[in-house]
From Swiss-Prot:
GO cellular component terms attached to this protein's record: nucleolus; nucleus
Major location (coarse): nucleus
Compartmental location: Nucleus, Nucleolus
Cited Gene3D superfamilies: Ribonuclease H-like superfamily/Ribonuclease H
One function term, GO molecular function aspect: nucleic acid binding
Keyword list, A-Z: Nucleus
Name of the protein in question: Uncharacterized nucleolar protein C2C4.08
UniProt cross-references to Pfam families, sorted A to Z: DEDDh_C (PF21762)
Protein source organism: Schizosaccharomyces pombe (strain 972 / ATCC 24843) (Fission yeast)
Record keyword Nucleus present: yes
Classification via PANTHER family: GOOD FOR FULL DBP5 ACTIVITY PROTEIN 2
Length: 243
């Protein structure tokens, strides 16, 4: 018997010893293993919920504080090359006033989605789209990121930060980052009485849960606007007693 065979024999022997010790059938051992996995999944969900609660509290306090500024951002990338940013949606609250913007990158107007992702580039619902060069947009976003007391919000915000990095735009360390997926996870546990093992709910599904009618999603400007609406809808229902 070689070492590998001996190791396998020891493992089988230990498994058999446990089964015999507790007089468990193979089916009971399988059920026990399944139950352990279920409990572990619940523990992971509860840990995520604790983090989501903290993020929801920050969002609640910031939205209710007029001195807090917001940048809600969404990028659309070319479906055949995720390093090519074709659109950007920017919703801002600066000095208490909300503004909604949709930028299309002039360098890539000829690149259209539509095979895997809906092509809604022409369908901004909250104003006129602005066509700018990539360099001009980078300058615009960098300037916004210098706003004091700024909170950066995104739905799946890590993806938006990744796209910003693709453009060569780092997020300043003094900017507070909020993810509406996490805020919704806490909102869901509180008001919908559901605890999800995943925070990865789509924007469309979250808006449906919040009874927000949305049109032409996958237009970056619309997505940023609806993300801001979702954030406000959720935080408006929170009270300090929820935390």
């Amino acid at each position: 018997m070689n070492r590998l065979q001996a190791k396998k024999a020891v493992n089988v022997s230990r498994h058999e010893q446990k089964r015999i010790r507790y007089k468990l059938t193979p089916e009971e051992v399988k059920a026990e293993r399944k139950e352990r996995k279920r409990r572990a999944a619940i523990q992971r969900a509860e840990k995520k919920l604790i983090r989501a609660k903290g993020e929801a509290l920050v969002a609640f306090q910031a939205v209710s504080n007029p001195s807090c500024n917001f940048l809600v951002i969404d990028f659309e990338a070319y479906e055949f090359n995720q390093k090519i940013i074709t659109e950007a949606g920017i919703t801002m609250r600066i000095n208490g006033e909300w503004d909604y913007h949709h930028y299309r990158i002039k360098n890539f107007l000829h690149l259209r989605n539509g095979r895997f992702v809906p092509d809604e580039a022409d369908n901004f619902q909250f104003g006129d789209s602005k066509i700018v060069t990539k360099i001009a947009f980078i300058s615009i976003l960098k300037k916004i990121l210098k706003t004091p007391n700024l909170h950066l919000v995104g739905h799946g915000v890590e993806n938006e930060i990744k796209y910003a990095n693709v453009l060569g735009i780092p997020i300043p360390k003094d900017v507070t980052v909020l993810d509406t997926q996490n805020v919704f996870s806490f909102f869901q546990s509180l008001f919908l009485k559901e605890i999800s093992n995943s925070n990865n709910i789509s924007l469309a599904k979250m808006l449906t849960h919040l009874n927000i009618r949305a049109f032409c999603l996958h237009n970056a400007g619309n997505d940023a606007r609806y993300t801001s609406e979702a954030l406000r809808e959720m935080t408006n229902k929170f009270t300090l007693s929820n935390f």
